[in-house]
Amino acid sequence: MAVNGKKTALLVFATLIAFAAGCGKSDWKDSSAIRIKLDVDSLLNGMSVSIDDIFQEIQLVCLDSSDMISNSVYSGHNHYTFDGEYFYVLDEKSFTIHVFDSHGKFVHSSSKKGRGPGEFTMATKICYNADLNTIDVLNPIGKIYHFRTKTLEYVSTLDIKGKDLQAIHDFVPTRSGYLLYSNTLDERIWHYDSENRIANPCGIRLPEYLSIYFYAQDRFYSMGESVQTFRAFDGKCFNLDSSLNVRTSLVWDFGKRSAQLKAIPELPSAREYHGFLMDYSDNHVAAFNDIKCIDRTLIANVIYKRNLHTIVYNLASNQAKMFLKTEEGLPLVCGLVYDNSMMLLVDSHMLPEFISTEVLDEVSVREYQKATSTGSMAIIRYGRSGVKP
């Protein structure tokens, strides 16, 4: 998958989100961190990788709807979610939430556009909140709307307050409240304490000269019971524990191919940063676009040699794979993780790029054919039965 043109604007614009060392109570020592040392050139020149080498099962579900839904696989996975029974897709333009059952059958749609209770004119993410059993929608002005699962009946609005916190661009529910990401402040990661109803910074900062950020797929991912965040220029991961202590949890070591913060110049525009990224990626793993963890297996999308590559690393066996595309000719792009599966929402006209009927069972092949013939969107579900060791 070449990273250029329109795909570049959507996939790479913001892969320089770089969380620099924090202050205060944070512990930035790497002694207890997982260190993953990889020779990317040897991995790419080694044996080809089959999608069956990674997942036990791949399923496809056609979303049975005649409505045109504005969404793209390249805009990330913040506009759809799953609660174990139903899919929810937030239309990025109409602010309508479409509900489908787990088999793709259309249930109903609910327009949320407006200025009344439970309505909004801006939204950057939809998310299932397992602790509250609600569907949460983030308005970047600092509001989170709670809706009942399935019916989407409005429940309440959380108005998040915090000193200097004026905009929120990503969030993830936690047992104590929410972790928040803001791209307009030096302090990027905040914790909202539901009990005290206040947001406080976690001590993760972005270097001032990198304040010109680009679009990133996601700022958070879960590993077991913990929530992780990462800095995109080198993939270093940080664990945010229940006491708000921030510790380095994982370090990627690509040797001479590792990106270095000191090599990234101060540039005046995103366009110039894009040009630098492409040039830098000729000899370095220049950026991490996304990281996900499924059943002790890390899946990371990285920019190397001007393309989006995928790294699959099993934390139990310490075995690694890296590829541009699988031997079936398929890219593997990070999606929404639920239990031991990863889900990717794909437009019908892009299905041939992301999935092949050769890797699907008979039921999924019929769903694929229905999606392509009707122009419907589809959900690709990878590894619902678990990830291979």
Regions found by a protein language model. Give the residues of each.
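Eukaryotic scaffold repeat domains enriched in small/polar residues
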Residues: 22-389
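Bacterial N-terminal signal peptides
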Residues: 11-18
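Bacterial N-terminal signal peptides that target proteins for export
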Residues: 2-10
